[in-house]
Amino acid sequence: DMTGVTGAVIAEVDEKFQPVKGTEQFIECDTIGIAVGLTPDIALPSMADVTFVNAGRLGSQVPMHDRNMETTKEGIYVAGDSSGVEEASSAIEEGKLAGIAAAEALGKVDAKAAKEAKAQVWDSLNQLRTGPFGAGRHDAKEKIIEEMEEWKVKNNAC
């Protein structure tokens, strides 16, 4: 074995991605690969000067956004790792949601068709956000959306 890898210690992490003591487990393996981001990619939303919120399980600070993935800056949408770290399937679905919402805002899709398409995407996202890990992501996303609604009321933005 040229890598010298004989195993890995895995552990649960808290909302700051720090290991939770007592949850460590050793797994025998000869290769370790990382295939997902561990922190949100917020460079572009930062340039747009959107409002950020602490999303905990989604990787710390992320842009505040509504159910259509629109941020506090009208016409600026986020999806995938820019809206919080999840998984590729969720990122794809969020991209669809943002695209549908943007097309609707531009008058390229009528409201009824957009509503139906967004409902299908939300059904898919809700299915992806189940189970022991998905439920936490679901709750974190709902909290972001709630905070966005509060922000809209406070800032007279609708």
Per-range role (PLM):
Residues 1-158:
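Residues forming the flavin
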